[in-house]
């Protein structure tokens, strides 16, 4: 019988997955009319957390092997998507910055003026998403299940944070298009802190597992 903290983690993880799914929906609806490419890695990360939570629950409840294999395949496919899109978007942002710096008059001033918020909103989330996806791509799903048992409560909380972050990302993108940078700065600052906490928690869990 699983311990109290693992069961609590599964329950909170299920709730966090619902939050992540809600955030994913809002994010996609908003980004459909704004910047869909930059939103994809965050959305894919939300999908991954939902799949990971479902796999953990199926592992606890003893679901069929076919169901587990289907979830395993979907989860690994999503991890690959996170890594690929994250790297592509980060590369695109860097390319845009270099192009503006060297080919646009006053380009350096434009970058200093506008790009800090852009980096916080797009570069950091996609870099972190790509990093997490790349690291976990090389971890088997069995090890992921063991991680979810040992760090179930923490991972559940992280899924809730990602769900909230997805809503925040979409909201700040919308606010930027309507009200400009001043309102946007607060949102991207919160995003940067949240992503840093998310990356730190997962990397710590992986390091503890490996060493």
Task: Put a short name on every predicted segment.
Residues 109-121:
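Short aromatic-rich membrane-water interface segments that cap or initiate transmembrane helices
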Residues 177-181:
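Membrane-interface helix caps and helix-loop-helix hairpins in membrane proteins
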Residues 1-95, 100, 108, 125-171, ...:
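Membrane-interface extramembranous regions at the lipid-water interface
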């Amino acid at each position: 019988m699983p311990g109290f903290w693992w069961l609590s983690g599964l329950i909170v993880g299920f709730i966090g997955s619902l939050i992540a799914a809600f955030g994913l929906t809002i994010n996609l609806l908003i980004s459909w009319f704004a910047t869909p490419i930059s939103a994809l890695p965050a959305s894919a990360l939300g999908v991954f957390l939902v799949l990971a939570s479902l796999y953990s629950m199926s592992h606890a409840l003893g679901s069929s092997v076919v169901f587990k294999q289907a979830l395993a395949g979907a989860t690994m496919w999503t991890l690959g998507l996170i890594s690929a899109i994250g790297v592509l978007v980060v590369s695109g942002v860097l390319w845009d910055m270099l192009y503006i710096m060297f080919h646009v008059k006053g380009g350096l001033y434009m970058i200093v003026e506008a790009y800090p918020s852009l980096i916080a909103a797009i570069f950091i989330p996609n870099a972190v998403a790509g990093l997490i996806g790349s690291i976990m791509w090389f971890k088997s799903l069995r090890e992921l299940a063991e991680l979810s048992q040992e760090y179930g409560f923490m991972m559940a909380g992280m899924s809730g944070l990602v769900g909230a972050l997805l809503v925040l990302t979409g909201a700040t993108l919308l606010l930027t298009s309507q009200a400009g940078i001043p309102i946007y700065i607060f949102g991207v600052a919160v995003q940067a802190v949240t992503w840093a906490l998310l990356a730190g928690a997962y990397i710590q869990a992986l390091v503890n597992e490996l060493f």
